[in-house]
């Protein structure tokens, strides 16, 4: 069914909106009560119309990425923003605790994809919880643990959601990766299997005996320099980053995402930079999201690189130094 929906939108011909609406609801397990069904359908149809018009522009060679249906198609961007996005302040005192990354003329490859060598775990889904910062944190921790121990482990986002509040994070209402590092300097991070994700903030259930990894320090790139971020990712493995999300990002399907409206000065969503490359003369970042595999390129987005710090990708980047716990 997913392939059918994608094919319909790719050619830009919907046929029956009724059929597609019901198929979409079944695919994403959407159920509404009474008048809310029509309200959600009205929003859905506006988004579908925008997707069709945008993809026609793509077919004409006017834009470099496509849009598609996903689990968010029945939401306005304002609703989506209120539920999933939180402005991530760069004014926090905690941001001065990291070590600004310096490449020291260390050469990095022209392209790299850390997925190919086992440094990136499967795409995860944060669900109805504003915990992107926790997924960004575990993503970069997973890469560093693999680098040090040659073992791939999926770490617990739920532990960070439940337990790092005293370090400045707000569970499902937002947080900062660097606050999480400060917490992990004192407590070991458990695995996903020992402390599974629930998408709801709960009481801290940390078990010291099950802690696996800790943070001893962290590198930062806060300058907005994509060259510095490339050096960090190319030399040190996947890095936690944050970006400014706007409506087309919410509906992104494939291609190299280029936005004229997102800001390089503010960020509201944490993700993971797992590599970079070039296609058809356009440089891009490979970015892992935490919205499941039905979003984007099976959970990933390629974002234009060397375009003036587009969407602020190099404004709040970090990478922890990881060791075994205790």
Curated annotation (Swiss-Prot):
Gene Ontology process terms (BP): proteolysis
Active-site residues per Swiss-Prot or TrEMBL entry: 132, 269, 289
Cystine connections: 129-172, 163-204, 262-311
Molecular-function GO terms, alphabetical: cysteine-type endopeptidase activity; endopeptidase activity
Record bears the keyword Signal: yes
Prodomain residues: 16-106
SMART domains (alphabetical): Inhibitor_I29, Pept_C1
Record's GO cellular component terms: extracellular region
Taxonomy, superkingdom: Eukaryota
The protein's role, per its UniProt record: Thiol protease. Probably involved in interaction with host tissues. Displays a similar activity to that of papain. Has high activity on Z-Phe-Arg-NHMec, but no activity on Z-Arg-NHMec.
Entry's family note: Belongs to the peptidase C1 family.
Protein name, entry field: Cathepsin L-like proteinase
Source species: Fasciola hepatica (Liver fluke)
